[in-house]
Amino acid sequence: QFILGPRLLGLPLEEWLFFVVIPFCSVFIYEVAKFYLHSIDFQKYVRLFFYLLVLVFSVFAVLSFGKWYTFINLASNVVFLIFVLNVSSFQKYLTHFLIAFLVACVPMFIVNGLLTALPVVEYNGTVFSNVRLFDIPIEDFSYFLLLMLMNVFVYEKSKQLILEKKSS
């Protein structure tokens, strides 16, 4: 009733489109934040925020062992955040990334809230923590953070490699 019908590898077309459209839109929001807020840089505080997030995600990952989606989601965030926080060339992008993430959470909150309030998206309680912000599983926010951070990281690294190649 809520999907078009075509499936690829067992997943609805809409699910596959999510993995293309959302990252593209997120990178756009990130670029807009960089352009309009280029003078804002709270790198020290943002790094501290992300280190605290690593700590919180680590604790909750351990506590959620057995709820496999929650565990893998949080553990993946921990690993990638530690990696990103140790790549010195990416540090200058963290402030704008965090701003873009917070802005991108607004439409994500609205759309995801509608999808989870209606019977469009249902979650298997045996693999999720069942902790929700309104109707949205908290894992959706950490998953979105990871998805957006990976895409922005690859985007910035690709730009850097292209510029280095052009200058040589």
What are the language-model segments listed below?
Residues 2-17, 128-142:
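Short aromatic-rich membrane-water interface segments that cap or initiate transmembrane helices
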Residues 4-10, 27-41, 55-65, 129:
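Short juxtamembrane and helix-loop transition motifs at transmembrane-helix boundaries
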Residues 17-31, 76-82, 139-155:
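Hydrophobic cores of alpha-helical transmembrane segments in multi-pass inner/ER membrane proteins
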Residues 35-39, 156-168:
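Membrane-interface capping segments at transmembrane-helix boundaries
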Residues 59-71, 88-91:
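Membrane-interface helix caps and helix-loop-helix hairpins in membrane proteins
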Residues 71-80, 100:
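Hydrophobic core segments of alpha-helical transmembrane domains in multi-pass membrane proteins
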Residues 77-96:
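Alpha-helical transmembrane segments in multipass membrane proteins, preferentially the mid-helix core
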Residues 97-104, 113, 117, 124-152:
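C-terminal transmembrane helix-loop-helix hairpin of multi-pass membrane proteins
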